[in-house]
Curated annotation (Swiss-Prot):
This is Rhodopsin, G0-coupled. Residues 1-17, 82-95, 159-182, 264-271 are extracellular. GO terms for cellular component: plasma membrane. It comes from Mizuhopecten yessoensis. The modification N6-(retinylidene)lysine is found at K282. The lineage of its organism: Eukaryota, Metazoa, Spiralia, Lophotrochozoa, Mollusca.
Amino acid sequence: MPFPLNRTDTALVISPSEFRIIGIFISICCIIGVLGNLLIIIVFAKRRSVRRPINFFVLNLAVSDLIVALLGYPMTAASAFSNRWIFDNIGCKIYAFLCFNSGVISIMTHAALSFCRYIIICQYGYRKKITQTTVLRTLFSIWSFAMFWTLSPLFGWSSYVIEVVPVSCSVNWYGHGLGDVSYTISVIVAVYVFPLSIIVFSYGMILQEKVCKDSRKNGIRAQQRYTPRFIQDIEQRVTFISFLMMAAFMVAWTPYAIMSALAIGSFNVENSFAALPTLFAKASCAYNPFIYAFTNANFRDTVVEIMAPWTTRRVGVSTLPWPQVTYYPRRRTSAVNTTDIEFPDDNIFIVNSSVNGPTVKREKIVQRNPINVRLGIKIEPRDSRAATENTFTADFSVI
């Protein structure tokens, strides 16, 4: 016997073909979400170099997305192919709790990650405050924040019910009781408007920093200092990734927030378009790994190593042009060179760069103003017998 809807007045009549389309879409999101987020977790387990404090936000995002993709999406797909919600009331509450909890964690992690990027790029003096302890405390706060909002419906502040498209469960957005309305308004403000403000501020300041730096280049100071082409490419990439991340957040959660706000005023969408906000939100589990992790060279390199260990691995491959830069060995031993690497711009220098012959080594670039990048170095000696001058090519990925 089908589990009855709690609010039959808002349930939509959907054709079997539309149910199948929803089922196929959710199945694809489930497969991509499981594989993509699982790869991120494996990368953290295999490669120590990606375990920088800020990347723990990416790991947190992957864990929460993996949980809902493994446990929640199969329930949605099975219900869609059955043309109705096939699990009981307890299953509805468990599903809604898992998915809503994952959504809140994802939203707040987006906000925390964007603010950390703002500090790293625009507030270099405070960069050292982003330590592993600080990040772990922030993650604990995010999970506690999510637990508060997702446990509240289980204890009487609003409730979990089947959604208007009867293949999933969520908060009773369409409830008109005092508890339902107050909870909906509070969630929209605390879980959407507040983190969205942080994201817009952070990426807006990053863009402003880029625009101001471009303006300074056109002044007198620009005539006295040369900015390498690859640094300009990095800055453009920072701007692009910032817009990409903000757009991904808006696409995933803005339609859902709008529908939830409209539900307060008893506005109902009487066709299958009501399913789109839910589908957009659920798709975020599938594309988050590609936006937040696979734009990072370290992640990509390890994924290539995991997926194709039989191929020749080329570290640091990206779309950025590789500049030719000269380095001069300070001293040479039988196995290792300790080098000073000089760039045309004296704002940039490499700390403790060491190579063992013509091999690949990933190091850090420390730049005082304003972009911080990681450096992948591929040593290409002009003469294997020469000890005075070599060249290397470099690839940069934005932190």
